[in-house]
């Protein structure tokens, strides 16, 4: 009882350190993309998905001809050593990394409702270390080709697309919440810069989605 009655000693610095510690922690959370500071609002939890700026390879339109927004959610990022079309194209072993994303299109229910599709983005991590070091959450909504142009001066100059029908693997089925073996539209994307191969992508798109628009005959792909 006597010990409980004794006053607790608090030094002058102890009243300041927690504040500094909290501020540093908040700064770290902002840097990690976990929280966002907005003027007039305060600090809020960052959205788990973000809208993709100016999609190029897969665009969908509503009934009025407006481009539907695409939201991206990065699911994983890892080194890729297995064989595939990216291997011969990029020639980047053992530095090939793949970022796996789920892409969400939001539509009114009367137009079919929301739908998802799946993406693998392959690149040479030795050339583009920023995609390896930033948090996965920070990559949500990022236009990778624009980031490559802005930070590394590598502008997209040519794109080749290959389309086929492909059965959903267990991984793809889990990401899209569909049955394994479901027939999907597979889109393989080979992207080039002035210096050669830039990146390779795989898209898996449910067959019931609306018409896909792929426009690669643009005057300035760097603006995309």
Task: Specify the residue positions occupied by each region the protein language model found.
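N-terminal helix-turn-helix
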Residues: 1-45
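Fold-independent oxyanion-binding glycine-rich loops
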Residues: 18, 48, 188-189
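Short, cationic-aromatic polyanion-contact patches
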Residues: 41-58
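A generic structural motif
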Residues: 39, 49, 78-81
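Long, compositionally biased intrinsically disordered regions
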Residues: 67-68
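C-terminal all-alpha effector/ligand-binding and dimerization domain
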Residues: 71-224
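A general secondary-structure junction signal
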Residues: 39, 47, 165-167
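Short aromatic-glycine motifs in intrinsically disordered, low-complexity regions
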Residues: 58-64
């Amino acid at each position: 009882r006597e010990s409980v009655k004794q006053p607790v000693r608090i030094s002058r610095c102890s009243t300041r350190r927690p504040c500094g510690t909290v501020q540093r922690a908040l700064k770290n959370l902002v840097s990690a993309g976990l929280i966002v500071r907005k003027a007039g609002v305060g600090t809020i939890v960052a959205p788990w998905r973000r809208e993709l700026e100016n999609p190029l390879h897969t665009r969908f339109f509503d009934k009025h001809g407006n481009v539907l927004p695409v939201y991206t959610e990065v699911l994983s990022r890892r080194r890729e050593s297995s064989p595939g079309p990216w291997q011969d194209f990029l020639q980047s072993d053992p530095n090939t990394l793949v970022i796996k994303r789920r892409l969400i299109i939001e539509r009114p229910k009367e137009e079919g409702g929301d739908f998802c599709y799946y993406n693998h983005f392959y690149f040479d991590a030795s050339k583009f270390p920023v995609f390896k070091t930033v948090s996965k959450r920070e990559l949500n909504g990022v236009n990778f080709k624009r980031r490559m142009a802005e930070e590394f001066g590598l502008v997209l100059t040519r794109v080749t697309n290959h389309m086929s029908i492909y059965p959903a693997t267990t991984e793809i089925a889990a990401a899209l919440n569909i049955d394994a073996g479901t027939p999907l539209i597979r889109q393989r994307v080979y992207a080039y810069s002035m210096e050669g191969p830039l990146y390779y992508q795989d898209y898996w798109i449910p067959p019931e989605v609306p018409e896909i628009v792929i426009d690669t005959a643009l005057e300035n792909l760097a603006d995309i």
